Structures are given as structure tokens and as C-alpha cells.
A protein has these predicted regions:
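Carbohydrate-active catalytic/glycan-binding domains of CAZyme proteins
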Residues: 22-313
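Sec-dependent signal peptide recognition
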Residues: 4-14, 21
């Protein structure tokens, strides 16, 4: 298998199906929009959960996790609410957290993956877009070293856009902003109009732009992908979509990120509802991905990992 994954710097709606009932488990890792970083042989998980900032969890095996507290506390930011969808990258000896707060994009820096992270500057796209709604950023380094940020902007619903970043991984390059994808497929038309939570893979010369569609509140929140021979698109959505939806009794499966585990396998971290009758809490789950001979991206037959939270002594 040959692929390239850049990690230098990534109300319930019941329609036609009666889902399996899932009991909320206090031992789950309560992260939505999860992101997993492997650093020095330890897994670090970040996500949406706390009103006070961004939590971090650690694990040796992807199954058992410890809550290591707040990696980013709101006192170290200019914002006070809606800390969502963090991704952490190790760059030149520092750790950079891309995240959204109050529906704007920010970057914070730390000397440790555990934090404390401190906000750098103001909203990342303010000079380019002004004070406008932007969430769900992910950073991708192309094979030629060019840095791209994919993110979500509201334009007739949540749509995915991209912009080039300078070598500092922080400064948007003027003239490079472009729209990538928007709601277009029948399976994506369950209220509201959403394409969000982007992530990028490069496999054998093809770029895979993965995303989530439908409301996160819906049991039909799901993951799909689009491909292009060029990082600038145009993007063609796969006929195999959605590739992650209501799997193994899990509902509302979405807002994923990818990472390479210790064995070199391509893994996907995503969230799902813990209950068939409530949106919250959402919890983190981990699957294994593969590319078929035809170039399709799909889940393998390996069971979904259901991370467990180790109680504090």
C-alpha cells in the first residue's frame, strides 16, 4: 500500500430506519471532531468537548485513554466559547494547534503536545475574509512542500474551501482562496446543507478530499470523499459515498481525521452518538482504512476500536 498523509503540522433526525439502541457509557472518550497525533510513541487525542477550551487524552494502545486535562485553556485565547475541531502538528520543534473558537479560525502554540497552548495572533483569515464564519481547518503539505489549509465557510450552507499558507504555516497567501466542494449528492441532502470536517490524503498521485455531510445532530451524519489529480481540483465525488455511515450500531458517524499508527496502518478517528435518542454525548471511535486496487477509499473489515477512558485514581 502506498499513500501519503501529511501530519507535519489535521437534533436527532429519524427518517426511514429504526436504529439500534446504544446505551451511553461513562467509560467512553467524550470527544467529538477527534484528532489523533502520534508523537514519541504516545497517542494524543484532541477534540470538541469542554466549554473551557481543548482537552487532550493520551494512550499507549488506542484503546485505553487517560484525560490529561486542558491542552488549550480559554484564558490563553481571545475567545470564550465554542472551541471546536482542533488539529495539532509538530513543526520545527514546536506544536501548533489549529482550531475554531466562536466560529473563527485560530492557531495556538506550545512546547509540548500536552500544552499549555497559547493563541498566536487574531483570526487566521481575518485579513483575507474579514470577520466571517469559518470552522474546521486542516493543514496539508503537498509533495512539493506547498502548504494548504482546507476549511469550512458558509456559502449556501457549509462548504469546503482551501487557501495556500506561507512557509510559516500561519499566513494565508493572497490570491489562492478557492471553493472546493458543496452539497451536491442525494445522500448529502438530509437537513441542513453541510459539507464539513475536511481531511486530505494523497495516494498514488490522486488527492482524496474527505468530508462529512448532513447535520452532526443527525443519525445520518456520514463521511464521503472526492478525488482530483491536482490539489487545486476540480473535485469529483465518489460513487462509493458514503464510506462511513451507521456502522456497527454507531449513529451519526462523522467529522473524522486520519493518522498513521505505530504499525504503519492508515487509521480514521471519528465521532458517533452514544445514544439513539440523544445527540450528546458524542464519543471517539477508531477504524482502519485502505485503498482498493481500483483506488477507492474504504473501511477495512477490522472491528471498530471503541476507546475506553481510564478513571483517575
Amino acid at each position: 500500500m502506498s499513500y501519503h498523509l501529511s501530519h507535519i503540522l489535521k437534533v436527532a433526525i429519524l427518517l426511514f430506519l429504526v436504529p439500534l439502541k446504544i446505551s451511553a457509557q461513562s467509560s467512553e472518550v467524550p470527544l467529538a471532531d477527534p484528532y489523533v497525533l502520534l508523537y514519541d510513541d504516545i497517542y494524543y487525542a484532541y477534540g470538541t468537548h469542554s466549554n473551557d477550551g481543548i482537552e487532550v487524552y493520551t494512550s499507549d494502545d488506542l484503546v485505553h485513554w487517560k484525560n490529561a486535562g486542558l491542552a488549550l485553556h480559554r484564558r490563553n485565547t481571545s475567545q470564550t466559547r465554542w472551541f471546536w475541531a482542533p488539529e495539532v502538528y509538530h513543526i520545527h520543534g514546536k506544536f501548533y494547534m489549529h482550531y475554531s473558537a466562536n466560529e473563527r479560525l485560530y492557531v495556538a502554540q506550545s512546547d509540548s503536545p500536552l500544552g499549555p497552548f497559547v493563541q498566536l495572533g487574531g483570526p487566521l483569515l481575518q485579513n483575507l475574509l474579514g470577520d466571517t464564519y469559518c470552522i474546521d481547518s486542516t493543514v496539508f503539505v503537498d509533495s512539493d512542500g506547498t502548504v494548504w489549509m482546507f476549511f469550512v465557510r458558509n456559502d449556501d450552507g457549509n462548504c469546503i474551501w482551501q487557501v495556500q499558507l506561507s512557509d510559516d504555516f500561519l499566513t494565508p497567501v493572497p490570491g489562492t482562496l478557492r471553493k472546493c466542494i458543496a452539497v451536491s449528492a442525494p445522500w448529502e441532502n438530509i437537513w441542513p446543507r453541510v459539507n464539513e470536517g475536511p481531511s486530505i490524503l494523497l495516494h498514488q498521485g490522486t488527492y482524496y478530499l474527505t468530508y462529512s455531510a448532513n447535520s452532526y445532530e443527525s443519525q445520518d451524519y456520514a463521511v464521503g470523499y472526492a478525488t482530483s489529480p491536482n490539489v487545486l481540483g476540480p473535485w469529483e465525488k465518489s460513487s462509493q459515498n458514503p464510506i462511513l455511515r451507521r456502522t456497527e450500531g454507531l449513529l451519526g458517524t462523522g467529522h473524522h481525521t486520519f493518522f498513521i499508527d505505530r504499525k504503519g496502518e492508515l487509521r480514521i478517528a471519528f465521532h458517533a452518538h452514544s445514544s439513539a435518542s440523544a445527540i450528546h454525548p458524542r464519543a471517539m471511535y477508531i477504524g482502519t482504512m485502505e485503498f482498493t486496487h481500483e483506488g477507492h477509499l474504504q473501511l477495512t473489515s477490522q472491528p471498530i476500536v471503541r476507546p475506553k477512558l481510564i478513571a483517575k485514581p
